[in-house]
Design a protein with these regions (language model features):
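Hydrophobic membrane/lipid-contacting segments
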Residues: 2-195, 199-290
């Protein structure tokens, strides 16, 4: 049954419905939970289990009877491990990290007539700034940073012909929840968080496909692919790579109700179209044997 995705159920459905890939040459299915474990391993390798983001930024030029100045804000947030939630049919992932500790302070700095905030060049505890007291972030209000990050493909991370699917935080849309910095709008704070992630090249790899022609069988060499995310009747969230090899990209999506037999202990599956199996794998094997 669909609510008990066993290997037997999957094989019976594929036998009954025949061409279940709906025109795709191959489909890789991976459980969201398995990808999450992979992401957590990457997080540990990148951060040793602790991640701190810190920014110093300047506001616009202001005037007073004593001269021109700007407001300078600095913050430091220590983040907990990320949680990742894939969004069906949109190829985006929602990433949330709790702010487990942090501090902020603000001050003023004298500026001249040509001052530009983007090039103020301030550093943490900059001696040019008249600083106010350090204030701790109220972690009792459960502050978090949330990012909506697109799944994208980049080449060359592993070798020149490898296409790697990544979460690239430089393109993310960020929201900071339950944190208020004096004189700083929520949009300004979100922009500073995004700037930190872009500057620090924070990415997570999902999977890689090698487009080289090293395979003895061209029908098994990817030429194009696209993403798909589904939630099955049993509640499993599955990330799919819909792969084109020697055929043409299909317009639809696979019609397999439960592509991963989780009740039989599986966390992923690779499906190859019957066209390739019979025409390019079995026939090639028979011809080679003959």
């Amino acid at each position: 049954m669909a609510d008990s995705p066993t290997l037997t159920y999957l094989l019976n459905q594929m036998y009954q419905d025949k061409e279940v890939l709906n025109g795709w040459d191959a489909v890789l299915n991976v459980l969201e939970s398995a990808i999450n474990q992979f992401f957590q391993a990457q997080y540990q390798a990148k951060t040793s289990g602790q991640m701190t983001i810190a920014q110093v930024f300047c506001g616009p030029r202001l005037t007073s009877p004593h001269g021109a100045y700007c407001v300078v804000t600095q913050f430091s947030f220590t983040l907990g491990p990320p949680s990742f939630v894939f969004t069906g049919s949109s190829n985006t992932v929602t990433v949330t990290q709790a702010i487990v500790s942090g501090s902020t302070r603000s001050g003023s700095m004298d500026v001249d007539a040509g001052f530009q905030p983007a090039s103020c060049g301030c550093v943490p505890n900059d001696p040019r700034v008249t600083w106010g007291p350090v204030q701790s972030i109220d972690v009792g209000s459960n502050p978090t940073i949330t990012a909506i990050v697109q799944l994208t493909s980049v080449t060359g991370l592993i070798n020149p012909t490898t296409h790697t699917i990544v979460l690239d935080f430089a393109t993310g849309a960020f929201t900071v929840n339950n944190v208020t910095l004096q004189g700083v709008t929520s949009q300004q704070l979100s922009d500073q968080i995004k700037s930190w992630f872009a500057t620090n090249d924070m990415t997570y790899q999902v999977a890689s496909l090698d487009f080289s022609d090293g395979s003895s069988n061209p029908a098994l060499t990817p030429t194009q692919f696209q993403f798909n995310v589904i939630q099955t009747n049993s509640g499993n969230i599955i990330v799919q790579l819909l792969i084109t090899t020697n055929g043409s990209p299909a317009a639809g999506i696979p019609i397999v109700l439960e592509p991963i037999p989780t009740a039989s202990g599986y966390t992923c599956s690779l499906m190859i179209s019957s066209r390739i199996v019979f025409s390019n794998i079995l026939c090639a094997g028979f011809n080679a044997a003959g």
